[in-house]
Structures are given as C-alpha cells and as structure tokens.
Amino acid sequence: MGEPTWEAAEDPDRTLRERLRRGRTLLVSPHPDDVAYSCGGLLAAVGRPAHATLLTVFTRSAWALPRRLRRAGARVVSERRREEELRYCRLRGLAEYRPLGFADAGLRGYDDETELSSPAEADGVRGAVEEAVAEAIRDAGADTVLAPAAVGGHVDHLLVHGAVRGAVGPGGPLTLFYEDLPYAGQRDAVDVERTLREARGLVPFASVDISGVVQQKVRGMYVYGSQTDDECVRETLRHARRGAPRRWTGGTAGAGHAAGRRGAPHTERVWTPAPAGAR
C-alpha cells in the first residue's frame, strides 16, 4: 500500500486526480448512491480510475421514491439498487463492486428522525460492520481510501466512518473523507465546517473543481433513479456552489491552493484526519 505522502502537494486537486488515475482506490459508500452524490464529480474529473472498487455497506433496503417500488418490498428494492450500483460502476469505469449485505437503518427499526439522531455506539450491528469493513480494506490493497465524513449524523454513515477510522492505522493507505450529500447541502455551511473540524477531527485535503464535469456528476446521480429526485440534485449542487474554498485559511493541507482558485462555480471537498496534537 502507498504511503500517505501526497498531502503536502502544491496542487492537491490535481495530485488527487492523478493518484486515482494511477493507483488502487477503495470507494466506501454507506448506501447505494452515496459515492455518486458526494464525490461523483471527482470521479468524473478523473475520467477512468486505474483500479477502483466500490464498497457499499448497507445494501438491503425497503426505501425507494416510486411508491410502486416501495410496495414491492425490500427484496425487490434491494435488487433494483444493486442494478443501479452496477450501472454506475460501468458509467465511471470502476473495476469492482463489493456489497457487504447489511440491512440499512430503516430495516433495523429506525425512522426518519431517529436515524439522524441516534448514536452509532448503541447500534447492535456496529461490531459486525467494523469487522467487515476492516476485512474489505485489507483485501482491497488500495493506496487511497475515500469514505464518508458522516456529515448530517445519519447512523449508517457514522457506523461506516467509525469503521474506516478504526481500520486504517499508521502506514496504511491515504484515507480521505468526502462531505456526505445531500445532507451537507441541507445544513448551514458553518455547521458543516464545525462538524468536520471539531466533531470529526478532520482538516481540508483538497478542494476539487468539478465545474467542467458537473453535468456528468448529475448524470451519475440520476443512475440511482429509485432514490434521486430534482430536489436532491438541487441541494447537492447548491452545496457545491457555496464557494467553500474561499473560507479555507491557515496551515492546513491544500488550503493555500484552494483559496487561490477563487470563484470556482462547483467544487467537492475532501478531508483528512488532523495530525496528532493539531486539534
């Protein structure tokens, strides 16, 4: 596995794209659609990763936007979502798809409110998720791992975030965290920043300019037709237009470069754990 030595690059955006084009990448998604929503612009900008695996943790679900599909039940919904994942892998040139088969929060008894307010530590599936994610990271042999930052506090995202943080130690792959969408787009920008820096202990790694590929990102979102509506797309793009790079200051990785590229209409940010003692 590669050493995480790219953080000090003069142009972290370009360096990250080149890293994904040349190396082995593990894309960790709590549910089908999270990668497409949250870092699909980065993947579109990369073009075709050298070898990328999409690892989706909670792949059993009864939720879908179309009422007819919802009425068909969890087995049919889960199969539809698997088909959407495979189409997305083909669209983005991802080499492998690895579903872990866990039931999502809705099937575990959460409702719309409790899935966004419950601590991951109390969930009985936590240990099994941590074990499965750790095994998948070992098997992937990736030099870069992209995983959710758990912005928004969805219990499934918290479980996956914690599992990845626990699985990757010193000398492991470069581990980066994307801003969970559309959740980040539904929250005040200051609150998002506070969650990332204070609650998660992360610092900026790169602000990826996706302006030239934003329509490709949207196309990838609509691959997940069972989940994606126009409101979701609007929230996602609104977050990308917030101009977040101009707020980055100080001695964090990528901050100077991002601040210098003012006015990029659409961006995706990725974060990395703060150095020990930096919080």
Curated annotation (Swiss-Prot):
SUPFAM superfamilies noted in UniProt: LmbE-like
Residues given in the record as Zn(2+) binding sites: H31, D34, H157
Transmembrane regions listed in the UniProt entry: none
EC number: 3.5.1.112, 3.5.1.113
Residue ranges of the region described as Disordered: 245-279
Gene Ontology process terms (BP): neomycin biosynthetic process
Highest taxon in the source lineage: Bacteria
UniProt biased composition (Low complexity): 246-258
Reactions catalysed according to its record: 2'-N-acetylparomamine + H2O = paromamine + acetate; 2'''-acetyl-6'''-hydroxyneomycin C + H2O = 6'''-deamino-6'''-hydroxyneomycin C + acetate
Class of this enzyme: hydrolase
Cofactor: Zn(2+)
Free-text remark on how the cofactor is bound: Binds 1 zinc ion per subunit.
Keywords assigned: Antibiotic biosynthesis, Hydrolase, Metal-binding, Transferase, Zinc
Signal peptide (residue range): none
Pathways per UniProt: Antibiotic biosynthesis; neomycin biosynthesis
A GO term, aspect molecular function: hydrolase activity, acting on carbon-nitrogen (but not peptide) bonds, in linear amides
Family: Belongs to the PIGL family.
Role summary: Deacetylase involved in the biosynthesis of neomycin by mediating 2 steps of the pathway. Deacetylates both 2'-N-acetylparomamine and 2'''-acetyl-6'''-hydroxyneomycin C.
Protein name in the entry: 2'-N-acetylparomamine deacetylase
Organism: Streptomyces fradiae
